[in-house]
Regions:
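Conserved NAD+-utilizing ADP-ribose enzyme module
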Residues: 1-78
Length: 78
């Protein structure tokens, strides 16, 4: 599973949902799907795919300012 993050700070693309905090991280099933989404939005300079390993999830939680246990995920398209 992959997330898309900003190259500048590593913050993931999230879906805003009323009453849900932190916002769910949007996920793609594989790297090629994430890269295709980035390319479709002409976002190659700003974004990169990130494989959701345990270490990557710890870093995402730190970037988002929340415990890893409170993170939720929303598959694309959702």
């Amino acid at each position: 599973m992959y997330a898309i993050v900003y190259k500048s700070d590593g913050f993931p693309v999230c879906r805003q949902m009323p009453g849900v905090s932190p916002d769910p991280v949007v996920t793609w099933m594989n790297e090629s799907a994430a890269k295709a989404f980035i390319a479709s939005k002409a976002g190659d300079a700003e974004f990169q795919p990130l494989e959701l390993t345990d270490d990557a999830m710890d870093k995402l939680a730190k970037t988002m300012g929340c415990p890893v246990q409170s993170m939720t995920f929303e598959p694309y398209p959702g």
